[in-house]
């Protein structure tokens, strides 16, 4: 039985103001069933950042984990691309 069937998402850090927590904006695309046009959906996830390495604007990879708080169910896996200021 495989244990690692967890969701892995890629998104952009929109907030790093909380202690050891980042807010990640994940954008997905779906085709509209009637109009056949791609529609962009976005959702924000709170993720645990133990070493506080992610900064605002970074492109990051997050993975689903056990609930760490009321709204935090993801953890930071790695920073894919640093933000250019």
Curated annotation (Swiss-Prot):
<dbReference type="InterPro" id="IPR019979">
    <property type="entry name" value="Ribosomal_uS17_CS"/>
</dbReference>
<dbReference type="GO" id="GO:0019843">
    <property type="term" value="F:rRNA binding"/>
</dbReference>
<keyword id="KW-0687">Ribonucleoprotein</keyword>
<dbReference type="GO" id="GO:0006412">
    <property type="term" value="P:translation"/>
</dbReference>
<dbReference type="InterPro" id="IPR012340">
    <property type="entry name" value="NA-bd_OB-fold"/>
</dbReference>
<dbReference type="InterPro" id="IPR019984">
    <property type="entry name" value="Ribosomal_uS17_bact/chlr"/>
</dbReference>
<keyword id="KW-0699">rRNA-binding</keyword>
<dbReference type="InterPro" id="IPR000266">
    <property type="entry name" value="Ribosomal_uS17"/>
</dbReference>
<protein>
    <recommendedName>
        <fullName>Small ribosomal subunit protein uS17</fullName>
    </recommendedName>
</protein>
<keyword id="KW-0694">RNA-binding</keyword>
<comment type="subunit">
    <text>Part of the 30S ribosomal subunit.</text>
</comment>
<comment type="function">
    <text>One of the primary rRNA binding proteins, it binds specifically to the 5'-end of 16S ribosomal RNA.</text>
</comment>
<keyword id="KW-0689">Ribosomal protein</keyword>
<comment type="similarity">
    <text>Belongs to the universal ribosomal protein uS17 family.</text>
</comment>
<dbReference type="Pfam" id="PF00366">
    <property type="entry name" value="Ribosomal_S17"/>
</dbReference>
<dbReference type="GO" id="GO:0003735">
    <property type="term" value="F:structural constituent of ribosome"/>
</dbReference>
<dbReference type="GO" id="GO:0022627">
    <property type="term" value="C:cytosolic small ribosomal subunit"/>
</dbReference>
């Amino acid at each position: 039985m495989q244990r690692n069937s967890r969701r892995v998402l890629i998104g952009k850090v929109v907030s790093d103001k909380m202690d050891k927590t980042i807010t990640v904006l994940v954008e997905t695309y779906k085709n509209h069933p009637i109009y056949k046009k791609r529609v962009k959906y976005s959702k924000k996830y709170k993720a645990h950042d133990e070493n506080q390495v992610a900064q605002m604007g970074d492109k990051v990879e997050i993975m689903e984990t056990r609930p760490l708080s009321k709204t935090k169910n993801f953890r930071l896996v790695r920073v894919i691309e640093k933000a250019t200021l």
